[in-house]
Amino acid sequence: MNNVLIITGPTASGKSKISVKIAQDNNGIIVNCDSKQIYKEIPIITDQPKLNDYSVKHRLYGYISVTQQYSVGLWIEDLKKEILSATAEKKLPIITGGSGMYINSIIYGLSQIPKIEDDVRYKTKKLFEDLGNKEFYALLINKDPLAKCLHQNNSHRLLRAYEVIEQTGISIFSWKKNTIRQPILNNFKLCVLLPPRDQVYKTINERFINMINTDVIEEIENLLSLNVPKHFPAMKAHGVPELISYLKNKISIDEAIETAQKNTRHYAKRQYTWFKNQFPNASFYDSKCQLLESIKNYQN
């Protein structure tokens, strides 16, 4: 798959807006690379584009239910279809988003871990729900000592590690280390937008206030009504845990706002370091104007 643009960077760095401008100038289609913006029930809290506002096509936004099991492997298959479709239409695919695991899988490929059987997946989830994070973590590292590097509160990765060791008898970390990974793309330009941090932090704070002033509370109430298991990815989207705590009368709305803003800022701070370490050969930009100028007239 040839001639693809990847626009990434920390949350609230301005990726979406700059991607629209690039798409307008280069006959492009925007394809989502944000692991939370795939969910159709939570467009406000995940800051999904308002598709009717734009004159360019957007793909893979709000098309998966929060109740569905989804993975980076499934997303890669959906991505391939969208790139082929864009190429057939003679349009430039512009992959946009900040989910590190998704971007890493595009550039370096996926480890060839066997598909997990449904019964193993079900039993693992049931075990996790019965034991809770702490006891489940202890059980996991007893079966797979390499899993000690995982944080016991990262339930998504704990479940995945347990499923793999349970079905294959081999640590997920051994699979990743010892299998050959095939890159998804052959010819692409990776652009990382890294504006000044204080600018990003300011945007994070303002964006969450704007969400509160819209229908985000109603959106989270609806999410709660779906009884989604708390370890599902959608339940960990920025702002969701804090607003759920507010709706359950555990904290005030002011505390929810302040905590969500703080946690999102901390996440953005980690993203700055992660992008620089993971993609040293990428093109880095500290402003949207600089990025626009560098890829002017980037054509298929």
Curated annotation (Swiss-Prot):
Chain residues that bind ATP: 9-16
Catalytic activity from the UniProt record: adenosine(37) in tRNA + dimethylallyl diphosphate = N(6)-dimethylallyladenosine(37) in tRNA + diphosphate
Question: NCBIfam families under this entry?
Answer: miaA
Where are the residues marked Interaction with substrate tRNA as a site? 99, 121
In Swiss-Prot or TrEMBL terms, this protein is called: tRNA dimethylallyltransferase
Pfam families in the record, alphabetically?
IPPT (PF01715)
Q: Which GO terms describe its molecular function?
A: ATP binding; tRNA dimethylallyltransferase activity
Q: Where is this region: Interaction with substrate tRNA?
A: 34-37
Q: What is its EC number?
A: 2.5.1.75
The function of this protein is:
Catalyzes the transfer of a dimethylallyl group onto the adenine at position 37 in tRNAs that read codons beginning with uridine, leading to the formation of N6-(dimethylallyl)adenosine (i(6)A).
What residues bind substrate, as annotated? 11-16
Protein family according to the UniProt entry: Belongs to the IPP transferase family.
Which classification does the entry list for the species?
Bacteria, Pseudomonadati, Pseudomonadota, Alphaproteobacteria, Rickettsiales
Give a yes or no for keyword Membrane in this entry: no
What quaternary arrangement does the UniProt entry report? Monomer.
Which cofactors are named for this entry? Mg(2+)
